[in-house]
Swiss-Prot record:
Its EC number is 2.1.1.-. Gene3D superfamilies: Vaccinia Virus protein VP39. Exhibits S-adenosyl-L-methionine-dependent methyltransferase activity. Belongs to the UPF0677 family. One of its GO terms (biological process) is methylation. This is Putative S-adenosyl-L-methionine-dependent methyltransferase Mvan_1344. It comes from the Bacteria. Keywords: Methyltransferase, S-adenosyl-L-methionine, Transferase. S-adenosyl-L-methionine binds at D130, D159, L160. GO terms for molecular function: methyltransferase activity.
Length: 305
């Protein structure tokens, strides 16, 4: 189903299902014999969503031979990819709070459990913004698991296409204080103009000393949805009745690093393969034709004093 300007979702549908997919990846990465991350809530959250494709993935019941490259090496590279991505954003949180930032905003938080699993310094406030159905599901499920936030946790149930800055302020956000912003796995699901608006709003809300962690997928400019649809066909054949490529907004858009630099941020980009080296993981195959989004660049930015 094509995206619309006012579409909504829960963790089992549309864009929400991609959050469940990412959580399943975090669960697999956490179960690795030599884990880079530890997300004890990823697996129970995925199971609570109840999409059979992802529960079978957790149970090792998927027939990987149906995928174009379901070799053990390729599967491990995918698990490692989720591990290094998660660790990058975890480390950005740690670097920001070590520098004295006590206000963290996670945009489109999905099934992210950082407010519960990271060791936040005393006095840290973590705001999470996402669709109301996603926020309600995660908060209720984690409470049922007996999980407790490790920081002051302020969920903000709102669509990011609405006036989320006003909702953030209403939840207690203080724009006069530096903020650590996380926008993980979000940008490809925004139209190009909405991506610019997102960073305009972040900049307007960011005191000097604030930070941003996000990523940029260069392949989104000439994203081939038919190729992506063919690559994801086995997922549909195994029961995941969601057309993942239709959720993405392709086409020309601002380069995240250039756009943020133009807004006065000091920006650093790290290609995904460099993250593998940083965290001691074997280099994955070059993206080439195997990844319609190309080689993702992980971006961190700092607003100077």
């Amino acid at each position: 189903m094509a995206r619309t300007a006012d579409d909504s979702w829960d963790p089992a549908s549309s864009v929400g299902a991609t959050a469940t997919m990412v959580a399943a990846g975090r669960a697999a990465a956490s179960a690795d014999p030599d884990p880079l991350i530890n997300d004890p809530y990823a697996e129970p959250l995925v199971r609570a969503v109840g999409l059979s494709f992802f529960t079978k993935m957790l149970d090792g019941e998927l027939d990987l031979s149906q995928f174009a490259d379901g070799s053990p090496e390729r599967v491990q590279a995918m698990i490692d990819g989720m591990a290094v991505r998660t660790r990058f954003f975890d480390d950005c949180c740690g670097t920001s709070t070590t520098a004295g930032i006590t206000q963290v905003v996670i945009l489109a938080s999905g099934l992210d459990a950082r407010a519960y699993r990271l060791g936040w310094p005393a006095g840290t406030v973590v705001y999470e913004l996402d669709q109301p159905a996603v926020i309600e599901f995660k908060t209720r499920t984690l409470a049922g698991l007996g999980a407790h936030p490790t920081a002051t946790h302020r969920p903000v149930p709102i669509d990011l296409r609405e006036d989320w800055p006003a909702a953030l302020h209403a939840a207690g956000f203080d724009a006069s204080r530096p903020t650590a912003w996380l926008a993980e796995g979000l940008l490809i699901y925004l139209p190009p103009e909405a991506q610019d608006q997102l960073f305009d709003r972040i900049t307007a809300l960011s005191a000097p000393g604030s930070t941003i962690a996000t990523e940029y997928a260069p392949g989104i400019i000439d994203f081939d949805d038919e190729k992506a649809r063919a690559m994801s066909a086995p997922m549909r054949e195994m029961g995941l009745d969601i057309d993942m490529p239709s959720l993405v907004y392709a086409g020309t858009r601002s380069h995240v690093m250039d756009y943020l630099a133009g807004q006065g941020w000091e920006v650093t980009g790290v290609p995904r393969r460099e993250l593998f080296t940083r965290y001691g993981r074997p280099l994955p195959p070059e993206a080439g034709d195997t990844d319609p989004l190309g080689e993702i660049v992980y971006v961190s930015a700092h607003r100077p004093q």
